[in-house]
């Protein structure tokens, strides 16, 4: 069927991309924009751009990934990864309000890491009370004791 054929073709283009054929990223974007292979390639591309400290270009790639994975028929896992990476870039450039905005979709999420990220951004904005609430939610959500301790340290630094 058509979907299977598209998946096979996207897989072949993705494998060529992994072998170093950068023009295949454009082919993936243009010919298979909603394919999981395209999403993986975009995530990989953003990582490479960040390694080269090209944050603006990485943001553009991640925003494209976010847009193509959004919605009812989107890919929620890739969308969440895109949003996390976008938020982390915004945190690193002190664009705290943009970090909070990109994470807003997950404000009721049970993922403690999302609460921790949002708390970091809120702290940067000077919204201490909301940051404390988010850190508390992260602490409650983490089962790993070392992660809890890290967030507890962040919380104690906010309270100083």
Please name every model-derived segment.
Residues 132-160:
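Terminal, low-structured helical/coil segments at or just beyond the last alpha-helical repeat
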Residues 2, 27-36, 64-74, 104-110, ...:
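Solenoid-like repeat scaffolds
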């Amino acid at each position: 069927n058509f979907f299977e054929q598209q998946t096979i073709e996207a897989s072949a283009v993705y494998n060529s991309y992994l072998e170093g054929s950068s023009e295949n990223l454009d082919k993936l974007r243009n010919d298979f924009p909603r394919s999981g292979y395209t999403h993986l390639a975009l995530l990989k591309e953003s990582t490479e751009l960040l390694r080269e400290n090209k944050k603006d270009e990485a943001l553009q790639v991640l925003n494209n990934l976010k847009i193509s994975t959004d919605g009812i028929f989107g890919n929620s896992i890739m969308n969440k990864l895109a949003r996390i990476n976008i938020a982390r870039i915004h945190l690193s450039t002190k664009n705290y309000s943009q970090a909070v905005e990109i994470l807003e979709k997950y404000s009721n999420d049970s993922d403690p890491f999302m609460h921790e990220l949002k708390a970091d951004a809120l702290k940067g904005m000077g919204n201490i009370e909301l940051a404390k609430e988010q850190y508390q939610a992260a602490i409650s959500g983490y089962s790993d004791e070392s992660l809890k301790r890290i967030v507890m340290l962040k919380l104690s630094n906010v309270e100083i």
